[in-house]
Amino acid sequence: MDHRLLEIIACPVCNGKLWYNQEKQELICKLDKLAFPLRDGIPVLLETEARVLTSEESQS
């Protein structure tokens, strides 16, 4: 994931900052507690494709 891209893109729900989880290949919105998948290195920034973070994940 190109870190320059992270400076440009935002959460499609709240327009907040996204954080990259390299282990899970996801972009995380801590405000909405959503994880957006990366498929073949491409962020899928659709709310319908996002998963809700567990309470443990949202606290870290």
From Swiss-Prot:
Mention any one GO cellular component term assigned to this protein in its UniProt record: cytosol
Question: Which NCBIfam families does the record associate with it?
Answer: PRK11827.1
User: Short name of one Pfam family for this protein?
Assistant: Trm112p
What gene does this protein come from?
ycaR
Q: Show the HAMAP family listed in the entry.
A: UPF0434
| Family that this chain belongs to | Belongs to the UPF0434 family.
Supply the name of the protein. Answer: UPF0434 protein YcaR
